[in-house]
Swiss-Prot record:
The keyword Metal-binding is assigned to this record: yes
GO molecular function, one term: metal ion binding
PANTHER family membership: METALLOTHIONEIN-LIKE PROTEIN 2A (PTHR33543), METALLOTHIONEIN-LIKE PROTEIN TYPE 2 (PTHR33543:SF19)
Species, as recorded: Solanum lycopersicum (Tomato)
Keyword Metal-binding among UniProt keywords: yes
Origin superkingdom: Eukaryota
Family label: Belongs to the metallothionein superfamily. Type 15 family.
Protein name as annotated: Metallothionein-like protein type 2
Keywords, comma-separated and alphabetical: Metal-binding, Metal-thiolate cluster
Function in brief: Metallothioneins have a high content of cysteine residues that bind various heavy metals.
């Protein structure tokens, strides 16, 4: 059974279908915080932790409102997504 029925919709919270797939962790989808602890990770010449911010964020499974009120990306709503 898919967590969101294979359908995306973009409502007031840009949620995903019936099962709440994209809205399952709303605190992670609505804000992202990057914490740098100096002395633990190698620093580059700009004072940033080496690597990209994308690696430090949730992982790209959240829905964002795109054009025509559709969730973009909507990979959380794939038919292969199974919530146990």
């Amino acid at each position: 059974m898919s967590g969101c029925g294979g359908s995306c919709n973009c409502g007031s919270s840009c949620s995903c279908g019936k099962g709440g797939g994209c809205n399952m962790y709303p605190d992670l989808e609505k804000s992202t915080t990057l914490t740098i602890i100096e002395g633990v990770a190698p620093m580059n010449n700009k004072g940033m932790v080496e690597g990209s911010i994308e690696k430090a964020t949730e992982g790209g499974n959240g829905c964002k409102c795109g054009s025509s009120c559709k969730c973009d990306p909507c990979n959380c709503c794939s038919a292969s997504t199974i919530w146990t």
